[in-house]
Amino acid sequence: MSNFKKSPVIFDEAAHTYTLEGARLSGVTAIVKWMFPDTYKDIPQSVLEKAAEHGSLIHKKCEQYDNCGFGDDLQEVREYVRLKAENGLTTLENEYLVDDGKDIASSIDVVFDKDESGMYSLADIKTTSKIHKDNVTLQLSIYAYLFERCNKGKKVGRLFVIWLPKEQYGKAELMELKRIGSADCKKIVKAYVAKEDATPYREKYFGGVEASTEIELIEESMPANLKDAEDEIIKIETQLKQMEERKKELKEGLYDLMVQHNVKKWQSKRLQII
């Protein structure tokens, strides 16, 4: 358990809203969308909603594992555990709520314990089919600014995106990102609150063109009906594999019984084993 400051902001998980003394605050993801409005513009809403549901499940499972030591029944969570272990990262907080006291608030996915330099690391979990580095760099940099504002004297050293994709889109990876300074983050937040045009800020801090990993965006470019078909096929293939394994186990069990009782042939109306 950490000794971080507890935010007075009230987070409504169902409505995904942040409220401070009756006033509604914006989330950091809204600032990211303002800065990069075209990231998901061509993706059907149904695909985005399905991806969001999957992402929420993985987030909750990772948090469950950190807090209770179980929940690693999914491959993505096992990869999360592996990445933490391989990089010597210890979770202090999940979904740690931070705010600027007036306009914005958000929950940081993971806060890791201090490193050798005495600074904390922040991480955001992504389950998308590829990583939009500029988007998550902005997101985590604002998180770092808010974290340090809420916890005077405590410093953030490293920012990580924990990429936990479905198996067909690549291997899970821990990516370190370069931080945008707090002074610049304050300027960006101020411009967002004032409803300024994001273009000058996007050009200044990101060169006007979004950078991403080289992973092909297969999932997001698929029409919803094809994506649904793909998911169903993968589900069926998994079930078939499981049933074949179970069939093998049962037949081996029957064969062992036949040997024990000196039965050379088993035959019924539905099954024959020799």
Regions found by a protein language model. Give the residues of each.
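Metal-dependent nuclease catalytic cores that hydrolyze phosphodiester bonds in DNA/RNA
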Residues: M1-A105, D113, E252
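Short, solvent-exposed segments of well-ordered alpha helices
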Residues: Q45, E49, D134, E220-P223, ...
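Surface-exposed cleft-lining segments at the edges of enzyme active sites
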Residues: V47, T127-K130, E237
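Hydrophobic (often cysteine-bearing) scaffold residues that line and stabilize catalytic clefts
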Residues: H54, I58, V136-Q139, R246
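A residue-level signal for conserved active-site and pocket-lining positions in enzyme catalytic cores
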Residues: I58-H59, Y143, I236
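Nucleic-acid nuclease catalytic cores
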Residues: D72, Y96-V193
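Extended, charge-rich alpha-helical segments
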Residues: V81, I234-I274
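Short, charged, low-complexity amphipathic alpha-helix
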Residues: V189-E245
